[in-house]
C-alpha cells in the first residue's frame, strides 16, 4: 500500500470560468470505479456549469468555503462540510470567499470523459 499526498500526486490546472486565473487539481486516487481529487480554487474563481451523465460526486471542504449551485439552488459549504451531486444534475462550483478554497472531489465512477457543458443540455432533459 502506498501513501500519497499532493506533493507526489499527478497535478493538473484548469482555467476559471471567471477571469484568467488557474485552479489546481491533484489526483490522489484513480481507478475504474472511483476518483479522489484535491482541488484548489483561488478567490473569485468558478468552474463551468456542467453535468455528468453517469457520475455522482461528493465535494468536501478542507479549507476556505465553496458555493455550489445545484440545479438552480445555491449551497454554501464551509470547513468540514460536504455535498453530494447526483449524476445528470447540472451544477457549478464557485469560490466567493476571500481565501483559497481547498476541497476533495470524490467521483463514482470517475468523471473524466463524462462532463457535458450545461448549455448543451435541453432544459428539463
Question: For the regions a protein language model found, what residue spans apply to each?
Answer:
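Well-ordered beta-strand scaffold positions
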Residues: 32-34, 39, 73-75
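A short, N-terminal "cap"/entry segment at the start of jelly-roll beta-barrel domains
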Residues: 1-34, 115-125
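Glycine- and acidic-residue-biased ligand/ion/polar-headgroup-sensing regions
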Residues: 54-56, 60-66, 71
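A short hydrophobic beta-strand segment most commonly corresponding to one strand
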Residues: 84, 99-115
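Conserved short histidine dyad/triad with adjacent acidic residue
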Residues: 37-52
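Structural motif
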Residues: 65-67, 74, 90, 100
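Short acidic-glycine-tyrosine-enriched beta hairpin
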Residues: 72-87
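Short beta-strand His + acidic residue motifs that chelate non-heme Fe in jelly-roll/DSBH
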Residues: 49, 68-69, 85, 91-97
